[in-house]
Design a protein with these regions (language model features):
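Amphipathic, well-ordered alpha-helical segments in soluble domains
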Residues: 26, 86-89, 126, 181-184, ...
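All-alpha helical catalytic cores of prenyl diphosphate-utilizing isoprenoid enzymes
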Residues: 2, 31, 35, 50-54, ...
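Conserved N-terminal diphosphate/IPP-binding helix and adjacent helical/loop segment
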Residues: 1-89, 93, 97-112, 160-168, ...
Length: 327
């Protein structure tokens, strides 16, 4: 199993004695996937999966589901959790191709080591294998949820490309893009976990949506404010790529000179950092954080009243952990 971050380790402990074992099974399932592909894609799939990460989406699915009633239910949850992570990994591989990214989580990307074609094929296979996992048990609910999430991911990516370089993007348009591109997979994780754990999927889907949106908003704040030694990338990387985020949108509403900025004219990290300083000089970062905190509070309020204490505590920790990651 990949080493958890301190925040993730706390969530694992809070989720109950069954969570570490289930996560180990998810990790074993991912390792089995990576080892089953053969040449030439196998090593690249393994490279992607072994890069680790927080495994937040699989963990969220398992926490929502609660302790399984038997091995058949546990196996279904493990497969679905692994599928969620495979889809998330696929999106990262494809993002690296679109962004010409050489590093991901401090490691070389498939794009940088094998080129854009091999990276594209690797991402495609990750997507395909995710659906193979959830169809093995005839899990049509998970198939439907993951299909909807993948459709949303694609639409969100298209919106991001359409909005590139445009500082006149509205807050509503930005939030819709985030809902599609980021929150949709959180929604699917929570809905699948709820279905497997005997809960109504709809309020849990809404819980996941708020958590995913807060996660993305705070990530965008960190792109402007975060030191490179913490984020692993220079400040303003999104701005250099032409990605218009909430801090920029709010700053443009407050400072006409920012609204008039031509993002295409940002030639290097130093210029992007200068724009970050101008954004930070407004209250845009504080307002972005405040919106994220509102979403976290809304997420907690969506947890069902009859939810058992263990699940409630662990899911509230997830919500708080999204904020703590950026404090």
């Amino acid at each position: 199993m990949t080493d958890p971050t301190p925040q993730t380790a706390e969530l694992v402990r809070a989720g109950g004695d069954h969570i570490p074992g289930l996560l180990k099974r998810v990790e074993a399932q991912l390792k089995e996937e990576a080892g089953s592909w053969g040449q030439p894609l196998g090593p690249h799939g393994g490279q992607t999966i072994s890069a680790g990460g927080k495994r937040l989406r699989p963990l969220l699915l398992l926490l929502v589901a609660g302790e399984p009633s038997g091995d058949a239910q546990a196996e279904r949850l493990v497969r679905a959790a692994a599928a969620i992570e495979l889809i998330h990994s696929a999106t990262l591989v494809h993002d690296d191709v679109l962004d010409n990214a050489d590093l991901r989580r401090g490691r070389p990307t498939v794009f940088s080591t094998a080129g854009p074609e091999m990276a594209t094929y690797t991402g495609d296979l990750l997507f395909a294998r995710a659906f193979t996992l959830v169809t093995q048990d005839g899990d049509l609910f998970s198939v439907r949820e993951l299909s909807e999430a993948c459709s949303a991911l694609a639409r969100g990516e298209l919106l991001q490309r359409e909005d590139a370089w445009n500082t006149a993007v509205t807050v509503d348009r930005y939030l819709e893009r985030c809902r599609l591109k980021t929150a949709a997979l959180f929604e699917a994780a929570c809905a699948i976990g709820a279905d497997g754990g005997g809960l109504d999927p709809e309020p849990m889907r809404d819980f996941g949506s708020r958590i995913g949106l807060a996660f993305q908003l705070l990530d965008d704040v960190l792109d402007v404010s975060g030191p490179p030694e913490r984020t692993g990338k220079p400040r303003g990387t999104d701005l250099l790529d032409g990605t218009v985020t909430l801090p920029l949108i709010l700053a443009a509403e407050r400072d006409p000179s920012i609204a008039a900025t031509d993002l295409r004219a940002l030639q290097d990290s130093e210029a992007a950092a200068g724009l970050c300083d101008r954004i930070a000089a407004t209250d845009a970062l504080e307002q972005s954080r405040a919106r994220a905190l509102e979403m976290v509070a809304e997420a907690k309020g969506l947890l069902p009243e009859g939810l058992d204490e263990e699940r409630r505590d662990s899911l509230e920790l997830v919500a708080d952990g999204v904020v703590a990651r950026y404090s």
